[in-house]
Amino acid sequence: MLKFVVRGASSGLVMAALLLACRGQGAHSAESRPVPTATPTANASATVAPALDEAGPSMDLLRSGALWHLYREGLVIPFAQEGFRKYSQEYANPWRGLAKIDDQTGRTLGATAATLRFPWDATTGEARLIVRLHGGSAGKKLSVRLNGRPIKNTTLEAGWQQVVMPLPSGVLTKGENTLALAAGKKGAIFHSIEIAPGETLPPQQPWPATSPVAKVQLAGKEREGLTGFSRLMVPVEIPQDGWLVVDSATLTGPARLRISVAAEGQPAKLLLDERQAAGTVRPRRLSLAEFSAKLVALEFSVPEGSPADVAWLAPRILLPKAASRQRPAPAKNLIVLVADALRADKLPMYADTRVRTPNIATAAAATGVTFTSTQAASPSSPPSHASIQSGCMPRSHGILGDKSKVNPGTPMVSAILAKSGIATDFVGDAGFAMNRLKPVSTWNEFHMPGKEGKGGDCQAVVKLMLDFADRQEGKRFFAAGVAFEAHTAYIYHPGTTEHYYDGPFDDAIGKRPDGVILTAIVGGRLKMTPERWGQLKGLYDGEVEHLDECFGALMVGLKSRGLSENTPVILLADHGEGFLEHGSMGHAYGQYAELTNVPLVLFAPGLGHGQKISAVVSHADVVPTIVDLMGLPTDPRVQGESLLPMILRQGPWIPRVMPSEYGRSYSLRSRNLHYVVDYGGHESLFDIAVDPAEKSELKDKRPLALRYFRDLAGIYLAHRAHWHAATWGTLNNHLAGFAPAKE
């Protein structure tokens, strides 16, 4: 018999499980949620798993405990665990730290009101809302509204208490629901909220555990798992060729165990439905190949037996082992060229485009690594350039908008490299973005060619970077340049622009349309005809082709100097450019894909060979990648992580979700989906795999995807300023160092 000792869970947890077992209750009653009707795949648990990559990229479903939705009879929201963030997406966080009183722990409401949004999948209407909290001092008022409907006004006692509120049929909505809490005074401490089906409260219902993660003793060994809840559900993106790996343990009694997977709009498919004898541990290796690249609801449940008597040990999603190419020798030098306002869909590695970029395309096929899903840190230059140079997101480096200043102590790639004796150089007329970074940067040379009378063309940028390389006389160097070709004004290039528009040139648009003209178009003061649109877009496309000529000159210049083999080049954009796809032009007007989906290509002989990587990456990953390529340790303040391991692995990678922000707006990007919250808090959801122009709004059609991104948005909003990918993981895949987990 296995000995079971729970650590890290409240004593009420075991009592709850025993009570449920005595009452004969399983994971969920018929009124709470129907059991999946699908039968198990015949060989679901018998399929022989390939050699799995235990040390490689994986999804740690245990460390991501905050992402699981917890159920007893109904949904449980425990405030003492970071998982409650899934239900709180308010821009101004009303919640404060933890408070422990009389052996119970809760979270303090630091405002007089808070809003929670939660999913509901029950099949009947009548339910009850159970609020467990500490009033702080007697006499506080608590008012509750659900989906805009008043539920109850109550006066709180001084200590811990349980307030039960019947919910009439029709108040709860299948799908997303909004719960509004209003308190007359600050300081109430919330332990948990439970939304359960049925009218009556079972007698002596104990309070739920504050976390699904607990340590158990198995045959004298301590292991960690998910336990204590009859049903656990997590929205998760399944990687290509992924395998679910988990050990199911039954402790003092037998239990029936289920594992199911449900893709959006599809019936749940049972991967496991089995009775497991008491005191046993069964390793489970379940193929998820059928769900590759899909967002699914993964569910562990205990339909029969005590939930406290079952532990799901070390649940993970692993990939098959894959070959990995040898890590290259440290690059001697490195160059970054940022093409301001360059749309990803203007390069042939990203889309079928009319724009001619033979130099970029040829180099990408020969020595390039193209990241096809790159999320800009921001749709505006100052925040994005700061992220490209620092490896941090806007909330961390401090430049949230166009007027912000950099936070003191922000790491900068120029300073990191200079400490190792590497000469650093910046070239570009990007003073609007780059001048504000000077207080924390270390540039040996800083050139603004237009202001220096050397021309504002990208040819001048390339020449000055190559001149800087010449002056190093064999010493290590790093050069960063900004080319303005795709930014307004869109300049006419004789013999190039004609590839896309050969006239006549309307004076209303001219041959150098700037931001004033774009504003006039948006405001309706400049009426656009098909010919004028052709002229405007032809000028932009001609600028991109001219940029390609400059890129070609850079690569030829490096080769002629004998530097091409040991000088990787990174080409990327700070943001994209809009042409009325969503009611505006230029950039900085929103978080849509034409602005935040940007190109990122690494050109490195011996490392790149034309491969494309579809895992989502970020501007914040650029600095740690630069430092890693040059053989140096990453500054611990950097928030992103090196992309070199992703490049070296000759196989799929784990799904990642990356953010972008600008002022109060933000967006979250997965490989196929894009969740956007605008300046006013309005949500949008797009499937960019089938709708790259983001014309079809899916928020009300894809409930699982909406819940997935709301979950991640709550975590993101609470911790974006301090996120550290190397130790915390990504928003959708947490690591052991995820600091709030220690609360």
Language model regions located:
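Extracellular and analogous surface-interaction loops
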Residues: 110, 114-125, 167-171, 230-242, ...
